[in-house]
Structure formats: C-alpha cells, structure tokens
C-alpha cells in the first residue's frame, strides 16, 4: 500500500475513533403519572439528545421496564430514571445488582417518591433507605416555584463550575423522612438556601415552607449515583388559559441548572473520575 493509502486509512480510523461515544446512557420512563412529570419527560426527550451530541455520549430512552435486566443493562454505562421507579421484583434486583457492580444512575424528582399508602408504597428498602438514603416522601411545597439553591460541596465534579448560590427552575420540592445530614454515606451537593423562604404559594399553609433544611441534590458515596429533586413543571391544572393542561414552566433551559446536570452526567460516565474520588476519601 502506498504512503498516501496508509495516510487515508489512518485518517479514517482516527475519525471513526473520534466519533465513538465516550459512554452510553439509557433513560427509563413511564410517562403516565401527573401532567407535570409528563411535561418534564417531553422536555428531557428533546434536551438530552442535543446534550449528548455536543458532549460525545450516546443517549437512548425506553418505556419498557422489562429492559431492566442484566443483559440489557450491560450495554449501558449510565441509567437514568426520568419519572418513576421499577415495581417488578426481578427488575429491582437487576437494578440493584447493576449498581453494586459499578453501574451509574441519575434520578429525577418522582423517581425518589415512596409513600404508604399510595400507588408507590415504601416497599423497596434498599432503594429508598440504603441507596437514596431519604426514606419515604413526607410533604411538598405547592405550587411549583423557583428556589435559591446553595452549593454544599463545591469540590464535587458536578458542582465545581457552579456559583455558590443560584436560582433554580420552578419545581415542586419534597421533604423526606430521613435527615440526610446524619447519613455518612450521603454527600449533599445542593440544598435550599434560606433566602428562598417563604417557599411555595399554597393555598394550603403546609404547602408553604418558612424554615428548615431541605437537600435537593445528593450522591451516595458507595455508588456512582446522583439524585435531583427537581423535575416537576408547573401546569395550568385549573385551565385558566385553555383546556390542555398547558405547561407554565420548564425544568431545562436554565443555564446554571443545565450545567449541573451535564457535569453530573459526564462525571457518572467517567469511571476513572469516580474511582479517583472514592480513593481520595
């Protein structure tokens, strides 16, 4: 083969390598519970592929929770729960095994929800208490409103490009059964800053928070994972505009909050970065 031919082959090989995704992400969703969660899901389905193209990773979605099995998960480096959690025992076992053997996970808002009695009862102890650490849902603010979020761990790869405080996109915010500050495995990355209070507009008094400590983003040091409490858009439930349950606010498109999600995903996709951080503890 001529030198020119070799050069062409090498160039093509290098070009192919450059286009190879750095890691692969699979996002699971249900898309059936609450118009606000479905609105966020539709956002995510448009936003994540654009982010993936810009940051050289692969992003796929599925609403088939039957894919939560060892064979399917082996194709992916990161799993995302966009709205709900798995309910089938075999799917739960497969997800736990995936995480305990080095898999990575990102969860949004309702994926952390558990309440007995409800359609999503507190019946998965490993996930809600060991993995997430938060236990059951206790209460929430209403309506979805923006909050001032404060960075609690500025050294984490997901937060190191963020200002000390910033204003989030509107969301419904959860209060949890467990105090995450008392859990040594949990690294709280962001919490609601006191300048947010009063947070929520009601109309019920308990839906407006006036004080307290509320984590909204955290990781578990024993796993490659991150949880975001946001992911609930404001909806025209009262049909003041029209009869379509129109979306009144969006989770994505906030530059600072977007940076948090992107950096968190790049961190999850980088196994070496995670290993280095655990080794430095």
What residues fall within each predicted segment?
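Catalytic beta-strand/loop cores that center a nucleophilic Ser/Cys/Thr
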Residues: 140-227
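A glycine-rich, often tryptophan-bearing local segment used as a flexible ligand/cofactor-contacting loop or short
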Residues: 85-164
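Extracellular ligand-binding/catalytic regions of CAZymes and related secreted enzymes
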Residues: 18-23, 27, 39, 47-50, ...
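Short, solvent-exposed loop/turn segments at secondary-structure junctions
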Residues: 32-33, 86, 112-114, 193-197, ...
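Bacterial N-terminal signal peptides
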Residues: 5-15
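Helical hinge/lid and interdomain linker segments adjacent to catalytic or ligand-binding clefts
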Residues: 24-115
């Amino acid at each position: 083969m001529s030198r020119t031919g070799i050069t062409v082959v090498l160039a093509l090989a290098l070009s192919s390598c450059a286009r190879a995704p750095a890691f692969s992400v699979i996002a699971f969703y249900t898309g059936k519970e609450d118009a606000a969660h479905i609105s966020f899901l539709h956002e995510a389905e448009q936003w994540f592929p654009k982010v993936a193209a810009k940051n050289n990773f692969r992003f796929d979605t599925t609403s088939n929770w039957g894919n939560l099995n060892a064979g399917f998960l082996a194709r992916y480096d990161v799993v995302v729960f966009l709205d709900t959690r798995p309910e089938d025992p075999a799917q739960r076992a497969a997800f736990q095994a995936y995480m305990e053997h080095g898999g990575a996970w990102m969860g949004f808002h309702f994926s952390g929800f558990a309440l007995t009695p409800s359609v999503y009862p507190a019946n998965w102890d490993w996930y809600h208490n060991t993995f997430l650490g938060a236990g059951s849902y206790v209460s929430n603010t209403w309506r979805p409103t923006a909050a001032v979020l404060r960075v609690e761990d500025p050294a984490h790869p997901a937060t190191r490009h963020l200002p000390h405080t910033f204003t989030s996109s509107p969301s419904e915010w959860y209060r949890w059964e467990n105090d995450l500050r008392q859990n040594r495995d949990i690294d709280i990355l962001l919490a609601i800053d006191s300048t947010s209070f009063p947070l929520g507009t009601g109309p019920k008094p308990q839906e407006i928070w006036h004080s307290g400590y509320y984590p909204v983003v955290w990781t578990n040091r024993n796993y490659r994972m991150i949880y975001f409490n946001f992911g609930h858009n404001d909806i025209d439930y009262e049909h003041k505009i029209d009869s379509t349950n129109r979306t009144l606010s969006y989770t994505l498109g906030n530059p600072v909050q977007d940076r948090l999600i992107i950096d968190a995903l790049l961190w999850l996709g980088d196994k070496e970065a995670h290993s280095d951080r655990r080794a430095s503890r």
